[in-house]
Design a protein with these regions (language model features):
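Structural and coupling elements of P-loop NTPases
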Residues: 1-263
């Protein structure tokens, strides 16, 4: 939210250290701030990204401005100091003063992120869609895919000693977690949920493990910001909204059998 009055990127980075006790890996430098925020410098690829339109639909990628080059070089060195330790091969090249490629740096950032060694920090403004494109790229480059995540574990209500697990696979029984419930003026109660395993068709019944009741999923909606799309089928990894789950609440487990998830 660097376009907001009072926005201070350096202060926010320091807050991550002071308040969250986390180690930031700063990937961007903002170009301008508040009303003058126009773009970011990508410290991984050492390029400047500037947005010319208010809706963020068009942007230019160019060399770093001369007046920011020294700062960018200094901040990139700080970034390399943080991320190089995440990968032995990268660390060896770093200590040997060999030039690290973009692929080397991205590899180290991803490995360190997955292992919880540090937290990537990016700059932007979602309201005007500045930097969001780079954020989406970072999600793909650095965050875990379903294959990187361990199986979800849980138990049958009333039998907590018998731990069960579900892999992130379409072949396992259906399981999902309701993480948001809202009232929609057009379709009524909407239950947002993330599918951890299995598949489900529109009209199928699911068991709410909190209430023990079965409910029929009348509609499945894929949400696109301010629009929605009706779909007939979902599988592991999907995040959707369901219509017809009258008793669902935030935090409920939805399953084709009574299974309550703990992690």
């Amino acid at each position: 939210k660097l376009d907001r009055t009072g926005a201070d990127f350096d202060f926010d980075v320091q807050s991550i250290i002071d308040r969250l006790e986390a180690k930031p890996a700063v990937l961007h430098i903002p170009i301008g701030s508040e009303a003058d925020f126009v773009g970011v410098i990508d410290l991984v690829e050492m390029k400047s990204h500037t947005w010319s339109k208010d809706d963020g639909s068009e942007w230019d990628i160019s060399d770093i401005p001369e007046d920011m080059l020294d700062e960018a070089n200094s901040k990139r060195q700080e970034l390399l100091d943080v991320v190089a330790e995440a990968d032995d091969d990268v660390l060896e090249k770093y200590f040997a003063d060999e030039e690290l490629t973009v692929e080397d740096i991205k590899k180290a950032i991803r490995k360190g992120t997955l292992e919880g060694m540090f937290v990537p920090v990016l700059a932007g403004s979602a309201f005007k869609n500045k930097g969001v494109q780079l954020l989406l790229d970072a999600v793909v480059d650095y965050l875990p895919s379903p294959l990187d995540i361990e199986d979800v574990t849980g138990f049958k209500p009333g039998d907590e000693e018998n731990e069960l697990s579900r892999s992130h696979s379409d072949e396992d029984p259906f399981s999902a977690l309701a993480f948001k419930v809202v009232s929609d003026p057009h379709v009524g109660k909407l239950t947002y949920f993330r599918v951890y395993s299995g598949t489900l068709n529109k009209g199928d019944k699911v068991t709410n493990t909190t209430t023990g009741k079965e409910e029929r999923l009348g509609r499945i909606l894929r949400m696109h910001s301010n629009s929605r799309e009706d779909i007939d089928f979902i599988c592991a990894g999907d995040i959707v909204a369901g219509v017809g789950l009258k008793n669902a609440k935030t935090g409920d487990t939805l399953s084709d059998s009574c299974l309550l998830y703990t992690s």
